[in-house]
């Protein structure tokens, strides 16, 4: 019994599988148009696969033919056979319709998607093409503008620009030339001429002034300190100690004061600041650093025309408030004035006078004044 049941189940499964295969085949056959088969076999029996008769009132090439009601499929259950055709007719229409709808919907969806996508893609393509056309148009315009023949106004403009540039160039070249000439003239003035022997007097070789790497300006002022006080003045490179013994003879009204020997240094600072002053001046009208007595090595011309060198005394005012007077004339500040024998110096409003003499000077007048002073003192003491 069990074996018979299993065989029946197997046979039923096989039939079901064969029926499913046939139905799938039938679905594929139904996709093909059945119309050409009907045209080929118009006298086919009632059991053929022709479609049902058209309803009255509908027009068509099939509607003209009358079909017998015997050809219609009977709905009675007694006439149904177990053939594969009946099984095919018994298969539900829903899966067939679903299959057809799915197959028909896919291309529709694809078309709709393409229709939705195409406008956006077309817009992007149009935008890209328009941008390319613009760039090409700009490049063509630039090329055409470069290739265009230059008009008269443009030529005039270019010529004016060239002229302006040439004028500026000439102006700058002239300025450079002037500066160069000035520098050359200044250098030639600073050069020293060294005479050659008598045979080669016509050719004189100028010697350039060597650069000085010594301190100057503010750096020199910072380093030029004495006893913790910054000195306003710095000695020049031609400063020398004199061989001649110069002296200063001070007088206060008619009173003769002690002689000052000023030949041991190259410079003497005169002022009210006793800490740094070499020759102190105690009058309140004088400045702390009032003036400087300086010896300098300078050139002079001899009687035979040759050039010699000599150390001479000079006085320079350091910008004092009340000034320095040479022979009762005020001198300019920050400027050297040469001193000669028997010159008289005064500083500020002080009543003291300083007479400049040296060891070989005629001091008879001074000796006479000293003798008179001594006689007056003796007379006063006797009385």
From Swiss-Prot:
Record Gene3D superfamilies: 2.60.200.20
Compositional bias annotation for Acidic residues: 370-383
InterPro entries in UniProt: Cell_Proc_Reg/RNA_Proc, FHA_dom, SMAD_FHA_dom_sf
SUPFAM superfamilies: SMAD/FHA domain (SSF49879)
Name of one Pfam family that matches: FHA
Keyword field: Coiled coil, Isopeptide bond, mRNA processing, mRNA splicing, Nucleus, Phosphoprotein, RNA-mediated gene silencing, Spliceosome, Ubl conjugation
Oxidoreductase among keywords: no
Phosphoprotein listed as a keyword: yes
Major place of residence: nucleus
Glycyl lysine isopeptide (Lys-Gly) (interchain with G-Cter in SUMO2) crosslink site(s): 28, 100, 210
UniProt cross-link Glycyl lysine isopeptide (Lys-Gly) (interchain with G-Cter in SUMO), position: 28
Domain FHA: 268-331
Cell location: Nucleus
Modification Phosphoserine occurs at: 18, 33, 48, 50, 91, 145, 381
Coiled-coil ranges (or none): 153-194
Listed Basic and acidic residues bias regions: 1-10, 28-43, 99-134, 143-159, 359-369
GO MF, any single term: transcription regulator inhibitor activity
Biased composition (Basic residues): 59-90
Stretch list, region Disordered: 1-209, 359-383
One GO process term, biological-process aspect: negative regulation of canonical NF-kappaB signal transduction
Cross-link (Glycyl lysine isopeptide (Lys-Gly) (interchain with G-Cter in SUMO1)), chain numbering: 28
Subunit structure comment from the entry: Component of activated spliceosome complexes. Binds SMAD4 and CREBBP/EP300. Component of the minor spliceosome, which splices U12-type introns. Binds the SMAD1/OAZ1/PSMB4 complex. Interacts with DROSHA and SMARCA4. Component of the SNARP complex which consists at least of SNIP1, SNW1, THRAP3, BCLAF1 and PNN.
Protein's UniProt name: Smad nuclear-interacting protein 1
Species in which this protein is naturally found: Mus musculus
Gene this protein is translated from: Snip1
């Amino acid at each position: 019994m069990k074996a018979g049941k299993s065989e029946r189940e197997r046979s039923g499964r096989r039939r079901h599988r064969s029926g499913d295969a046939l139905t799938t085949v039938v679905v594929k056959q139904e996709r093909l148009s059945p119309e050409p088969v009907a045209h080929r076999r118009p006298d086919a029996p009632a059991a053929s696969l022709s479609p049902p008769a058209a309803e009255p009132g509908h027009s068509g090439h099939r509607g003209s033919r009358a079909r017998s009601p015997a050809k219609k499929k009977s709905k009675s259950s007694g006439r149904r056979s177990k053939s594969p055709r009946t099984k095919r007719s018994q298969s539900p229409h829903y899966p067939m319709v679903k299959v057809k709808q799915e197959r028909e919907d896919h291309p529709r969806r694809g078309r709709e998607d393409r229709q939705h996508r195409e406008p956006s893609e077309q817009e992007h393509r149009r935008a890209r093409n328009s941008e390319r056309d613009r760039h090409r148009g700009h490049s063509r315009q630039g090329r055409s503008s470069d290739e265009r023949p230059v008009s008269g106004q443009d030529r005039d403009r270019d010529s004016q620009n060239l002229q302006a540039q040439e004028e500026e160039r000439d102006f700058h070249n002239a300025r450079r030339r002037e500066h160069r000439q000035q520098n050359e003239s200044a250098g030639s003035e600073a050069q020293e001429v060294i005479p050659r022997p008598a045979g080669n007097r016509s050719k004189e070789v100028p010697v350039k002034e060597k650069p000085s790497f010594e301190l100057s300006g503010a750096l020199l002022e910072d380093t030029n300190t004495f006893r913790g006080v910054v000195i306003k003045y710095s000695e020049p490179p031609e400063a020398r100690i004199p061989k001649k013994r110069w002296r200063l003879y001070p007088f206060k009204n008619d009173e003769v004061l002690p002689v000052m020997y000023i030949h041991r240094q190259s410079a003497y600072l005169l002022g009210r600041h006793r800490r740094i002053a070499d020759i102190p001046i105690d009058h309140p009208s004088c400045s702390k650093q009032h003036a400087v007595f300086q010896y300098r090595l300078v050139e002079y011309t001899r009687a035979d025309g040759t050039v010699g060198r000599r150390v001479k005394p000079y006085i320079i005012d350091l910008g004092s408030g009340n000034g320095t007077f040479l022979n009762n004339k005020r001198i300019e500040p920050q400027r050297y004035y040469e001193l000669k024998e028997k010159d008289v110096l005064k500083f500020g409003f002080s009543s003291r006078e300083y007479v400049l003499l040296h060891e070989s000077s005629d001091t008879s007048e001074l000796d006479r004044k000293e003798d008179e002073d001594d006689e007056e003192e003796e007379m006063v003491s006797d009385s």
